[in-house]
């Protein structure tokens, strides 16, 4: 995957910002649903954090029928993800998708490292007040497809594949089913 220019800031300079995705927004089709300006910038690593899945205030996600991705500080661990360059006009749609107004996630500014070791500052999200819970098989699949699509390190992809999902076998929203189908056809 060709790398776009990753210069920039998570904050208020210029007309774009950098967003570090580690969950369902790893998959291009998923992020483009609400944030069409997103352009792949690079694969990056968030040091001293760990990936987790949970239900905000103990309530399962109605969209995904299981725990959704979050990160927490954990010395020695790392989370791999994708840095997307986005127009500032998409900040509100990204915040809405992440449930910022309702308190599901809070906006954080983090420093991530590219494969070349360059440090860049990005906007990201962290879930507050959650109980750990496994993801649905469908949600896990979207994350794994996004990791594969964008070439996250193979060892990290194997860790993602090893995550035990819950046993949900029902349907998820048509919109999410569509992004899974599009992702599958692109990756096959």
From Swiss-Prot:
Catalytic activity line of the entry: an alpha-(gamma-L-glutamyl)-L-amino acid = 5-oxo-L-proline + an L-alpha-amino acid
Residues given in the record as substrate binding sites: 19-22
SUPFAM superfamilies: Gamma-glutamyl cyclotransferase-like
Residues bearing PTM Phosphoserine: 173
Any one GO BP annotation for this protein: release of cytochrome c from mitochondria
Swiss-Prot/TrEMBL keywords: Lyase, Phosphoprotein
Gene Ontology CC terms: cytosol
EC number assigned by the record: 4.3.2.9
CDD domains: GGCT_like
Family as reported in the entry's similarity comment: Belongs to the gamma-glutamylcyclotransferase family.
Protein name: Gamma-glutamylcyclotransferase
Species assigned in the record: Mus musculus (Mouse)
Lineage: Eukaryota, Metazoa, Chordata, Craniata, Vertebrata
């Amino acid at each position: 995957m060709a790398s776009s220019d990753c210069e920039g800031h998570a904050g208020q300079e210029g007309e774009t910002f950098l967003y570090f995705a580690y969950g369902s927004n790893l998959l291009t089709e998923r992020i483009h649903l609400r944030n069409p300006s997103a352009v792949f910038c690079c694969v990056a690593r968030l040091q001293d954090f760990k990936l987790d899945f949970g239900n905000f205030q103990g309530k399962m996600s109605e969209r995904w029928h299981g725990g959704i991705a979050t990160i927490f500080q954990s010395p020695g661990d790392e989370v791999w993800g994708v840095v997307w360059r986005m127009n500032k006009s998409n900040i509100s749609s990204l915040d809405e998708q992440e449930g910022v107004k309702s308190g599901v996630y809070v906006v954080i500014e983090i420093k991530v490292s590219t494969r070349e070791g360059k440090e860049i500052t990005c906007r990201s999200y962290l879930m507050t007040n959650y109980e750990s819970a496994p993801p649905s098989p469908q949600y896990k699949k979207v994350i794994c497809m996004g990791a594969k699509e964008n070439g996250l390190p193979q060892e990290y992809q194997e860790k993602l594949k090893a995550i035990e999902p819950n046993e949900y076998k029902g349907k998820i929203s048509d919109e999410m089913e569509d992004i899974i189908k599009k992702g599958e056809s692109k990756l096959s």
